[in-house]
Amino acid sequence: MIIKVQKTFEKRLINAFMRKGNYIKAEKIYLKVVNRLSTIGIKNSYQFIRETLLKMTPIMGVVKKKRGVKELIYPKYLEPEMGEKLAIKWLKKTVAKFKGELLIENIVEEFVKASKDQGEVVKEKWALYKEVRYAISCNTRKGHHKSFVEQKLKATQRRKWY
């Protein structure tokens, strides 16, 4: 039996910023972001980062399955780790867009925007939810039977979210 060890939240975020195995540099980036948030006026910056990342994480996603020639899309509840992984991936993608400015300033700015439910990462999250709504509307059957989508959603119940 394999026991999966949970990494702490900070380690998962630091590993996302790491490039070419340079852990020390990634840790410095994370600590500079925390210091910058505290100089802005946020009292508990660690808690602030965790809460804003939870605001960025999607709860539902879309699964594509091929049935014959057709490719159908179905909504699915995401695992907490998968939702967090998507949010960190979107954060890295939005920070990489602004190459001319400082990396730390971009990360801090994105966290502050996400705390106010704005920013690129939150837009990505709502775009994913738009796909989920489209998947639900496409796959519902008319009639008195339960729709296939409702059965799929019931089968993938949402697990404990932190």
From Swiss-Prot:
Q: Which Pfam families match?
A: Ribosomal_S7
Q: Name one GO biological process term.
A: ribosomal small subunit assembly
Presence of keyword ATP-binding: no
Gene3D superfamilies listed in its UniProt record: Ribosomal protein S7 domain
Location of this chain's protein in the cell: Mitochondrion
Bridged cysteine pairs (disulfide): none
- The main place the protein resides is mitochondrion
Q: How does it assemble?
A: Part of the small ribosomal subunit.
Q: What is this protein called?
A: Small ribosomal subunit protein uS7m
Origin species, per record, is: Dictyostelium discoideum (Social amoeba)
Name of encoding gene? mrps7
